[in-house]
Amino acid sequence: MQATKEVITSLENAGLDLICDGELYRFDTSHPETNGMIEYFIGPMEGIRGELDAEELAAYQEKKGMGFRTKPPGIVHDAIKTGSLDLASPCKRLKDLATKPVKFTMTGPHMLSKTVANSYYGSTEEIAMAFADVLAGQAAQLNADVIQIDEANLPGHPDESEWALRAINRVLDAIPTTGAVHLCFGNYAGKRVQSGTWD
């Protein structure tokens, strides 16, 4: 809480108009590959198991585009449900601590669907739509001035944009305030993890 408070104060003192919380509470040193961008969201959800057997792990390590992770954040083994995911509480904390308008961020359904292993759904698109349903339910409860969906994997996979946009739009449609989408190439710790284009 103190670190979050310091981030907010620093941003306000710097004169920013829209304040975020820095996401420091999401970081897990056990999973530095994605700075808490994945595990924070899927860990509390139902239908995803954290431990994989040797065969499941080997299959994941063959998955194209996941070389930046040593193991998946989990394997989908049943229908994805909200579980104990609670984005409203950290959003409220941000709103309570800030004196200016705030932006709350959440990892998007495409990114989440690309990083998990799967033994339940028929396609990555189906996984993305299941994540979109959970995230839409969470987004509907948020009172931030701007709610941003972070999609760090999509620019490297433009061939998936059609179904990714359906999932992203499902979340955007649930946002009661202003929605935004942030695309990037996932440049964690100065290491580019995929190639792509902004075209």
Question: What function would you assign to each model-found segment?
Answer:
Residues 1-199:
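Domain-level signal for soluble alpha/beta catalytic cores
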